[in-house]
Amino acid sequence: MQRIVVIGGGAAGFFGAITCAQYNPEATVLLLEKSGKLLSKVRVSGGGRCNVTHHCFVPSVLSQHYPRGGKQLKEAFRTFGAQETIDWFAQRGVQLKAEADGRMFPVTDNSETIVNCLLQEAKRVGVQIRTGAGVDRITAVSYTL
């Protein structure tokens, strides 16, 4: 059986673990978080409302709203951009709204809406979660396909 380990219990770690579990249902997906708190930055982002994405559907323009790593994000946004993010949350019952400046938040204006969605989806697809599980090294192992 294939085992996949995702390091980090933030938004990217959760989304990565969920996606791995969806596309590899036979695999065991384990998410490791060093601290005891999952999704802590999600809880405080956007003043506790959680700025999920930006209301912009052109990858090269969307990447400009991310000053750190915008250049590297262009290709990622071509694959999974704002519309895909909106759709992903909508499919899980979370509606987003755009503010005048383009920032998008859950209609509840509460980051717990996003936190709960990610936690519930991880549980639904079978992601195993361990907190207090820091990683201090990764060792390569041999394998054959």
Segments predicted by a language model, with ranges:
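Beta1/beta-strand and adjacent pyrophosphate-binding region of the FAD-binding site
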Residues: M1-A12
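Conserved small/polar residues in nucleotide/adenosyl-binding loops
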Residues: Y143-L145
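Glycine-rich FAD pyrophosphate-binding loop
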Residues: A21-G46
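Active-site-proximal cofactor/substrate-binding loop regions of enzyme domains
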Residues: C117, E121, V125-T131
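Short N-terminal binding/cap micro-motifs at the start of the first secondary-structure element
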Residues: A12-G16, L38-K41
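Glycine-rich active-site loop/strand segments that organize a redox cofactor
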Residues: R49-A98
